[in-house]
Amino acid sequence: MTVFKEILGNITDIENVESYQIENIHLTSDDVLKRVIIISSDQNVEYGIRLEEDKKLRDGDILYKDDYKLVVIRLELSDVLIITARTIGEMAQIAHNLGNRHMPAQFTETQMIVPYDYLVEQYLQDNKALYEREKIKLKEAFRHCSDAK
């Protein structure tokens, strides 16, 4: 079994990507937080992944590259709640409440994204918050604040 120990780049940086045979390794958002991963690709080849502790996999990361072939990480869609607050005060209130539940979160300029949880959805409904439930491809995995570096 081949064990990958480094990230060679990202497929978005490859100009002539159509000239390569691409073998995909599909991972969940939770998988990419593990230190050691053993998984089969979409071509039923078993691989190990063991990166340095400070390295995190992202969608499109290349683990193998030669003149003809790429082995690429593909993150699966994650079931999330995308919260758009009407005011900064409302966002602070929501973030405070979800923080008390130890919910991992990601932020954009205008939105808070959290993993789907029916109790969180009920809280948002009860408080008439603007939100949508969607399945999206996260750029990186959810982490708790203590895990963030």
Curated annotation (Swiss-Prot):
Protein's name in the database: Urease accessory protein UreE
Localization in the cell: Cytoplasm
Family assignment from sequence similarity: Belongs to the UreE family.
Molecular function GO terms recorded: nickel cation binding; unfolded protein binding
Gene Ontology terms: cellular component: cytoplasm
Phylogenetic classification of the source organism: Bacteria, Bacillati, Mycoplasmatota, Mycoplasmoidales, Mycoplasmoidaceae
InterPro entries in the record: UreE, UreE_C_dom, UreE_N, UreE_N_sf
GO terms (BP aspect): protein folding; protein-containing complex assembly; urea metabolic process
Keyword Amino-acid biosynthesis part of the UniProt annotation: no
Function according to Swiss-Prot or TrEMBL: Involved in urease metallocenter assembly. Binds nickel. Probably functions as a nickel donor during metallocenter assembly.
Coiled-coil ranges from the UniProt annotation: none
CDD domains per the UniProt record, alphabetical: UreE
